[in-house]
Every structure is written in C-alpha cells, then in structure tokens.
Amino acid sequence: MGFWKFPPFLVLSILVLYQAGMFHTAPMRSAFGSPFDPATLSEEESRLLLAAMVNDYEQMKAREMQKQRAQGSGISVQKRSCNTATCMTHRLVGLLSRSGSMVRSNLLPTKMGFKVFGGRRRNFWI
C-alpha cells in the first residue's frame, strides 16, 4: 500500500529538482534588478551611505522622543501612582514620621514588641 504512494512523490520531487536546476542556470539579476553589493562601493560612497544611515537613525529617534513627550513619560507617572502594599506602607510611615509625637502619643500603643505577648491583653485603641 505504501508503494503506490511513493511513485507520485518521486515524480513530484524530480519535477521540483528539475525546475530548481533551470532557475539556477537562468540569471537571477535580470529578473529582480541589480542587487546592492556593498563590496563594490568606493570609500567616499560608503562614507556617504554611513552618514545617511546615521542621519535617518537620528531622525527616527527624534520622532520617538517627540511622541513620548506628547504622550507623557510613563515611567515617572507610574512611580507617582504606586498603589502596591509596599508603597502604601512607606507612605503611611512617612506620614507618621512627619506628624510628630502627637500621633504617636494618641494613636499608637505604648507597649509594642515581643514582650507584649507575655503580658495581659489590653485594649489600646479606646
């Protein structure tokens, strides 16, 4: 059964190889035009080409910078609007340290730390 599938594949592969051989003998440059070959450039032409490429690159980067300025920089905005637990904790610590002793004396319990667990329970928030 597999023998009957083999001859069409063989004929097709021979046809493809024959066509590929015909394409290799025909000149490819006439069909696609003259390709760019950097080895045939003089030194002055290569300098001009390099200068043009650098100029295009600088223009592309300038356009990208203008787009970023028009849209606004996303990095600084993201840092300002940080809502993670770590950021919120740092904000609260900063608020407590700036507010002074008034908040510490009124809102925070006096006994905090590892020694509190051995003592009796008190309601510090009343």
Swiss-Prot record:
Q: What is its main location?
A: secreted
Residues of the signal sequence?
A: 1-25
Q: Which Gene3D superfamilies match?
A: 6.10.250.2190
The UniProt entry, under Pfam families, shows: Calc_CGRP_IAPP
Q: What are the disulphide bonds in this sequence? A: 82-87
Q: InterPro entries under this entry? A: Calcitonin-like, Calcitonin/adrenomedullin, Calcitonin_CS, Calcitonin_gene-rel_peptide, Calcitonin_peptide-like
The subcellular localization recorded is: Secreted
Alphabetically, the GO molecular function entries are: calcitonin receptor binding; hormone activity
Presence of the UniProt keyword Membrane in the record: no
What does the record list as GO biological process? Answer: adenylate cyclase-activating G protein-coupled receptor signaling pathway; regulation of cytosolic calcium ion concentration
Q: Which residues carry this modification: Glycine amide?
A: 118
Propeptide cleavage-removed residue intervals: 26-78, 123-126
Tissue distribution is:
Mainly expressed in the thyroid gland and CNS. Found in the nerve cells of cerebrum, hippocampus, hypothalamus, pons/midbrain and thalamus.
Spell out the GO cellular component terms annotated for this protein, sorted alphabetically and separated by semicolons: extracellular space
Keyword set, alphabetical order: Amidation, Cleavage on pair of basic residues, Disulfide bond, Receptor, Secreted, Signal
The UniProt similarity line reads:
Belongs to the calcitonin family.
Give the function comment from the record.
Stimulates cAMP production in porcine kidney cell line LLC-PK1 via the calcitonin receptor (CT) but not via the CT-like (CL) receptor.
Q: What is this protein called?
A: Calcitonin receptor-stimulating peptide 1
